[in-house]
Amino acid sequence: MSAAPASNGVFVVIPPNNASGLCPPPAILPTSMCQPPGIMQFEEPPLGAQTPRATQPPDLRPVETFLTGEPKVLGTVQILIGLIHLGFGSVLLMVRRGHVGIFFIEGGVPFWGGACFIISGSLSVAAEKNHTSCLVRSSLGTNILSVMAAFAGTAILLMDFGVTNRDVDRGYLAVLTIFTVLEFFTAVIAMHFGCQAIHAQASAPVIFLPNAFSADFNIPSPAASAPPAYDNVAYAQGVV
């Protein structure tokens, strides 16, 4: 270390070049700062960050599967069959008033069966317009009931053919039997596509998306030349 007097009476103390007591230690960057810019994923989310969540992308397979069966057409056919049942049932009820022997009329099959067909057809038409899971499941449930009602109605109609001897009654029963069998197959087709749509919706993939934090920040590059070292210490005159 050397001391040189200045012209104004101030001593300037210059430490040697190899002295390391006054030199600051080199800056050490953390390991995470040395990563290249990009997308960094943290195992532990930082405080206040959103936790990873499982999201399900919109899947169009259930809708396409359900629409393949033309639910609007099937529903319209079911509504027409239900109205035919109500109409022919009312006619038979008035014609056979005071007479017994037709179980199809005495059991009210054309009325509760026709109402079931109309409800299932209406839900099928509504499910094609809105594509909601609730409507698809409701349509499936009512179609199952329609299949059961059509099967029971067909069995009762076949029994009535052996009971009545009037040609007029047999004609009405024949028409009702044809439309009841048609309703059975229509409801089975609608039920088939409804089951496929629900199965496709249940097997839709779930994608797990972890939190991704952007790290597109620029790390300052080291300077080409070191800045000048300010290693001169000035002492005022008379200060020890």
Swiss-Prot record:
It comes from the Eukaryota. GO terms for cellular component: plasma membrane. Signal peptide: none annotated. Its main location: membrane. The keyword Membrane applies. It holds the Pfam family CD20. The chain crosses the membrane at residues 73-93, 100-120, 144-164, 173-193. Keywords: Membrane, Receptor, Transmembrane, Transmembrane helix. One of its GO terms (biological process) is cell surface receptor signaling pathway. The keyword Cytoplasm does not apply. It is found in: Membrane. May be involved in signal transduction as a component of a multimeric receptor complex. Belongs to the MS4A family. This is Membrane-spanning 4-domains subfamily A member 15. It comes from Homo sapiens (Human). The gene is MS4A15.
